């Protein structure tokens, strides 16, 4: 009986002892801390940080996982992007396995300096730093089977080579490449832990100028002269948001181009207004171009926005040249052409007048009479002048002779009493007709010169009328081709 009671009591004590050990393991008691201290001291005693796990045996497999906290900046000028992330690596080191405590041990970050760590680096890194507020943001956690979890909070600036030919209607592909610096595939093998779910946080990011379209995880082996290395790549594709550029670049350029067309409705003799408007629009487009170049790298090829701004600049500049052409036509070349034309007309009239005088002189008989039958009867001007110089029918007598038609004018008697037809003498009319003809020709030439020298300033220029139609249609066609090409 006493034996049975002793066995029962021993079982109860053992159960209570096991329960106490479990409670002590789960609670931060002084005994538990001492156990952990003993475990850590035991693990680090004789640990050689210079040797990788399973040195000389199979390669160490290191799993990678990343949580993206933010993408802070994407710079076209420097061709890079800045990303803040939680970078975690895990591997198994049998030298760090323990059985005394069935718990994971999260240790101080300074313990990481006493353990072997993978020589991981970012291949396209430009500048990186480990956050150190309030202490270094790194974590080391040990599992009973020897698995080590090493986490860091890193901000890195990585290179991202961009093709800006379609800027700002472009899409870019940026990568973050991870590789071992010294260990080849014979010593260490990287892999994405969790496959496609190894990278998280990308789907909730909101960037001011970009939209993340997709992300891909790639693993490949690369060969260098020092050996083969396994490289992990995080690739994400981003699309630029066009809204900012429409408000800041495209709309101002369109409005300035349309503003330059206002000069087509301004009278062409208002030189100050049209020149001031044209020069102002040209300088404004130049300012927009200059500001844009300062925000982009100096690349050798033409970007999409360069094509658009250059097209707008050409339209604005052509609007200014259009007025220069109109001004030259109406106030430069026009008067010179009119002067040349009036000189040609004057020269032709003088030659005609000399020719007519020569013909008249050749057709005068010895008595000074003009034989009208030999003159050109179709010359209305000369006939009119001759008839007006002779006078009315009461003081003139027309006689028809065999040799032609002659004008005869009666001579006044010496004593002032009337005149007799029989006393008429042949009076030459050559000098009177020629003088009157010359006077009339001079008056007509002067009036024609006045008409030629005074342009009709009340009509709007035909060039301006056509410009009002051609410029908007051409600019609309330019926009149609531009947006169809670059958007699609």
UniProtKB/Swiss-Prot annotation:
Keywords: Cell membrane, Chloride, Chloride channel, Disulfide bond, Glycoprotein, Ion channel, Ion transport, Ligand-gated ion channel, Membrane, Postsynaptic cell membrane, Receptor, Signal, Synapse, Transmembrane, Transmembrane helix, Transport. InterPro entries: GABAA/Glycine_rcpt, GABAAb_rcpt, Neur_chan_lig-bd, Neur_chan_lig-bd_sf, Neur_channel, Neuro-gated_channel_TM_sf, Neuro_actylchol_rec, Neurotrans-gated_channel_TM. GO terms for molecular function: chloride channel activity; extracellular ligand-gated monoatomic ion channel activity; GABA-A receptor activity. Disulfide bonds join 160-174. It is a multi-pass membrane protein. The keyword Ion transport applies. Pfam families: Neur_chan_LBD, Neur_chan_memb. NCBIfam families: LIC. Generally pentameric. There are five types of GABA(A) receptor chains: alpha, beta, gamma, delta, and rho. This is Gamma-aminobutyric acid receptor subunit beta-4. It comes from Gallus gallus (Chicken). The lineage of its organism: Eukaryota, Metazoa, Chordata, Craniata, Vertebrata.
């Amino acid at each position: 009986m006493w034996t049975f009671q002793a066995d029962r009591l021993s079982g109860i004590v053992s159960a209570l002892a096991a329960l106490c050990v479990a409670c002590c393991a789960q609670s931060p008691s002084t005994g538990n801390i001492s156990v952990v201290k003993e475990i850590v001291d035991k693990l680090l005693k004789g640990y050689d940080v210079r040797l990788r796990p399973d040195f000389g045996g199979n390669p160490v497999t290191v799993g990678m996982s990343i949580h993206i906290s933010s993408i802070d900046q994407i710079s076209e000028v420097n061709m890079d992007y800045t990303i803040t992330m939680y970078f975690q690596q895990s591997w198994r080191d049998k030298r760090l396995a323990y059985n005394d405590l069935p718990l994971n041990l999260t240790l101080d970050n300074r313990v990481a300096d006493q353990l072997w760590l993978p020589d991981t680096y970012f291949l396209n890194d430009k500048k990186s730093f480990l956050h150190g507020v309030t202490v270094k943001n790194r974590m080391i956690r040990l599992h009973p089977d020897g698995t080590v979890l090493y986490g860091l909070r890193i901000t890195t600036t990585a290179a991202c080579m961009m093709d800006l030919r379609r800027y700002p209607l472009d899409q870019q592909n940026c990568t973050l490449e991870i590789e071992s610096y010294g260990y080849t595939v014979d010593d260490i093998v990287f892999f994405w832990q969790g496959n496609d779910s190894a990278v998280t946080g990308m789907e909730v990011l909101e960037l001011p100028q970009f939209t993340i379209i997709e992300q891909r995880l790639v693993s490949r082996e690369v060969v260098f002269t020092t050996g083969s290395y396994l490289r992990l790549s995080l690739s994400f594709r981003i699309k630029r948001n066009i809204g900012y550029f429409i408000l800041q670049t495209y709309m101002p350029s369109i409005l300035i181009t349309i503003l330059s067309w206002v000069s087509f409705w301004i009278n062409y003799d208002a030189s100050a207004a049209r020149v001031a408007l044209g020069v102002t629009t040209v300088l404004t487009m130049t300012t927009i171009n200059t500001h844009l170049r300062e925000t982009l790298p100096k690349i050798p090829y033409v970007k999409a926005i360069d094509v658009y701004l250059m097209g707008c600049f050409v339209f604005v500049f052509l609007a200014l040249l259009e007025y220069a052409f109109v001004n030259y036509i109406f106030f430069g070349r026009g008067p010179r052409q009119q002067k040349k034309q009036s000189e040609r007309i004057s020269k032709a009239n003088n030659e005609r007048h000399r020719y007519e005088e020569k013909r008249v002189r050749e057709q005068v008989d010895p008595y000074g009479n003009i034989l009208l039958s030999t003159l050109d009867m179709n010359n209305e001007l000369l006939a009119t002048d001759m008839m007006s110089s002779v006078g009315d029918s009461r003081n003139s007598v027309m006689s028809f002779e065999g040799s032609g038609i002659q004008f005869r004018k009666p001579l006044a008697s010496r004593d002032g009493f009337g005149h007799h037809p029989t006393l008429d003498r042949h009076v030459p009319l050559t000098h009177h007709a020629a003088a009157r003809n010359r006077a009339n020709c001079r008056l007509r030439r002067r009036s024609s010169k006045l008409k030629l020298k005074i342009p009709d300033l009340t009509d709007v220029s035909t060039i301006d009328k056509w410009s009002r139609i051609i410029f908007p249609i051409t600019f609309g066609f330019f926009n149609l081709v531009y947006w169809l090409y670059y958007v699609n």
